[in-house]
Structures are given as C-alpha cells and as structure tokens.
C-alpha cells in the first residue's frame, strides 16, 4: 500500500475484481508497508507519524473502496506480532489504522496479533499448531509463516467466516 506504485496496483486490483467478481475477499497486507513516505516536498515522513498514519488510512480507504463496490464479504486480517520489538510496535500501530478503516468500511477485521505471541505476549516462532502440538510457526526472518503457521493463520480467518455463514443461515 505504501509503495510508489500504489495507483498502478489499485488499477490492477480494480481490473482483477471486475473479472473475478468474488463473493468473499480475504485481505492481509502490511509488512511491506513499514517504510517511510516521501512528502510532496521530498522530505521523509517517519513511519507511524501522524502524517504517515493519515496517508496510510487514505490509501487503505482507496483499496477498501475498490473491494467494497463488489458487494463481497470482506475479511481484513491484521498483522501478527513480529520478532523485532520496533517492528512489532509498528505492526500494532498499523493494525490500529487497519482496524479503524475496516470497521468504518463495514468489513470484518480479524485480529491475529496476539495469536502468534507467547504467554507473556512476546514474539515466539513456536506455538501450538491446529492439533495442539508445539511447532515452528514462523520463518527465520521473524515475519513470515511456516506451513504450520499458515494453516493456523487460515484457521483464524476460517473461524470468522464460518461464524458469519452460520449466522446468515440462521437469519
């Protein structure tokens, strides 16, 4: 979202959604967005500064608008805890913006931040998989997931989706 090619990527998203016409859209973005911006005057804008947050919110709204017009059920997945403390703090701040924008746009926000933390709330590459066995869930970079981690991540999204589908059946 924070790349210099944002508008190009949004046109590609619009084109893709026009072709596919999905009923459900699941979105997870953010790790690559932890970069400073350049203001129109060329100065660096620090990550998580008020100006950065405002621009991040604007770009999220633009992306969400593209998805919203398709009348699909949208599940926006927040960032998990990250290994480096500064990265984890930035991820939490970004999740605040994502959650706010998702709620304002009528999307379901899926919070997974603490689901990949240890009992003390700190990053751990290990945790229970879907069977309860403790396994490596995160890659060596402290950001990405292993296969078991991806399955656990998908489980949290599936849980929200199933709950909404069951509620829709009941209504």
Feature names for model-found ranges:
Residues 1-4, 15, 45-54, 64, ...:
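Second-shell loop/turn segments in exported
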Residues 12-16, 62-66, 100, 160:
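A generic secondary-structure signal
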Residues 28-34, 38, 61-96, 113:
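Active-site segments of SGNH/GDSL-like serine hydrolases
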């Amino acid at each position: 979202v924070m790349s210099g090619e944002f508008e190009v990527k949004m046109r590609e998203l619009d084109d893709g959604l026009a072709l596919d016409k999905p009923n459900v859209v699941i979105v997870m973005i953010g790790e690559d967005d932890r970069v400073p911006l350049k203001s129109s005057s060329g100065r660096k804008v620090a990550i998580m500064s008020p100006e950065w947050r405002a621009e991040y919110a604007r770009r999220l709204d633009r992306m969400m608008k593209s998805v919203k017009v398709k009348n699909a059920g949208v599940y926006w997945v927040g960032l998990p805890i990250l290994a480096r403390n500064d990265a984890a703090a930035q991820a939490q701040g970004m999740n605040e913006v994502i959650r706010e924008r998702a709620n304002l746009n009528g999307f379901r926000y899926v919070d997974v931040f603490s689901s990949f933390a240890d009992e003390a709330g700190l990053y751990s590459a290990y945790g229970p998989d879907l069977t309860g066995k403790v396994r490596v869930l995160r890659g060596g970079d402290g950001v990405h997931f292993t296969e078991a981690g991806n399955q656990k991540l998908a489980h949290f999204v599936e849980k929200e989706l199933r709950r909404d589908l069951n509620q829709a059946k009941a209504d």
